[in-house]
Amino acid sequence: MDIIGGQHLRQMWDDLADVYGHKTALICESSSGVVNRYSYLELNQEINRTANLFYTLGIRKGDKVALHLDNCPEFIFCWFGLAKIGAIMVPINARLLREESAWILQNSQACLLVTSAQFYPMYQQIQQEDASQLRHICLIDMALPADDGVSSFTQLKNQQPATLCYAPPLSTDDTAEILFTSGTTSRPKGVVITHYNLRFAGYYSAWQCALRDDDVYLTVMPAFHIDCQCTAAMAAFSAGATFVLVEKYSARAFWGQVQKYRATITECIPMMIRTLMVQPPSANDRQHCLREVMFYLNLSEQEKDAFCERFSVRLLTSYGMTETIVGIIGDRPGDKRRWPSIGRAGFCYEAEIRDDHNRPLPAGELGEICIKGVPGKTIFKEYFLNPKATAKVLEADGWLHTGDTGYRDEEGFFYFVDRRCNMIKRGGENVSCVELENIIAAHPKIQDIVVVGIKDSIRDEAIKAFVVLNEGETLSEEEFFRFCEQNMAKFKVPSYLEIRKDLPRNCSGKIIRKNLK
């Protein structure tokens, strides 16, 4: 069944411009407070100009172009401008440093880069020291340096016509993007995403939150991340809604932005919820238009209840990963919600819990969460130039092994326990890091928490807790361990405690456990 009607991204934008015309499509707010607004007609024209810019620089169908940008209008222009001419976007996490960025450039085979002033010196160094296929750099926001192979994105774009000059034949099976995974445990892998994937993601995510053309979807998630692209942007555009892209998340500014733009949908991760909760209470906490808050793992029930009560919102749970493109398990619009369940499989998907021998398990049994979709359509196509890694997680019949541990109940509701790699082996017992973190997070002095396993010559692994305290608080080891002993089984109590100012996180707010020992 062809859910998207054979429509690729070029057709999508031409149709959106015709149907919605002068309706607001995109609002971008920079960290300095500068706001840019574009109607559907204007945004399509900017996308066309950007496509023509790439064509004048020699980019053709199948070429890869890297983007190393914070949230900005140019990211949207480039994303869809490349898609219109059949070229492939390679977004780079804006937090990555030289070695990591160089690795992605080389392994993606990108021949052109679009970036900004703050990142340009790093890429100068990369060009001097590393072998890459990079031929040209476009800068979006600075006077041009006297370097060969560097040009002004804005100047070149403004010289282009608003109608598309190069329109090669496109198929929904064509690759639109190679998105490298966050690599919290290993080298990132390039997730190949097709035009079909993105079109499907728009329809699916719009269905998931019952999105309408009069909605306003605000996100502070980074544009180089799958959540921003597929859960937010593609959903908003596919529904003819307004998409608000904020450059950087600020707990102090967030509710003001929600109120200013009259946002009806937004998305949150646990780090955001915890930092919003430590802001001083305000009489305006409930003065907003939010209908749904899309939420991604993982939060204790106490934290969830406190957040929903204070801000008068409800969380719409969505579970997925880069490889699934969208939240393939989640709460459904209009259905009952069963916290702490992550919901039920969405339409077009099947979900099972499987054992270590790849056999389906009955309700209540703990195992790996596995999802069935259609590669290149409802789930990712493959890992770029990595068939071995693809075969490890994706079966020929479309079953995807998530690497996550969970279980389901008799009614088909699924429950996430932990990443399989985050299960600690302690004296023959399996201990979930997430379970411990949710318990410890309930301590009134603790703002943030992560637990990891460290080598133990007697019990396989010992448990170490890293905590960030609320401002002005102190916490003794005696008080911490007493709290743990009162709230968890003895074999789950951490052996070590380290208090830190912050925890290392990647672009999506996930804690980078490999940096903690």
From Swiss-Prot:
Q: Which PANTHER family does the record cross-reference, listed alphabetically?
A: ACYL-COA SYNTHETASE, MEDIUM-CHAIN ACYL-COA LIGASE ACSF2, MITOCHONDRIAL
| Entry annotated with the keyword Metal-binding | no
* Species classification: Bacteria, Pseudomonadati, Pseudomonadota, Gammaproteobacteria, Enterobacterales
One of the record's GO molecular function terms: crotonobetaine-CoA ligase activity
- Give the pathway listed in the UniProt entry for this protein: Amine and polyamine metabolism; carnitine metabolism
Q: A GO term (biological process) for this protein?
A: fatty acid metabolic process
Q: What is this protein called?
A: Crotonobetaine/carnitine--CoA ligase
Q: Please state the Enzyme Commission number of this protein.
A: 6.2.1.48
Domain of life of the native organism: Bacteria
Q: Which reaction does it catalyse?
A: 4-(trimethylamino)butanoate + ATP + CoA = 4-(trimethylamino)butanoyl-CoA + AMP + diphosphate; crotonobetaine + ATP + CoA = crotonobetainyl-CoA + AMP + diphosphate; (R)-carnitine + ATP + CoA = (R)-carnitinyl-CoA + AMP + diphosphate
**What keywords are assigned to this protein?**
Ligase
- Role according to the record: Catalyzes the transfer of CoA to carnitine, generating the initial carnitinyl-CoA needed for the CaiB reaction cycle. Also has activity toward crotonobetaine and gamma-butyrobetaine.
Q: Which family does it belong to?
A: Belongs to the ATP-dependent AMP-binding enzyme family.
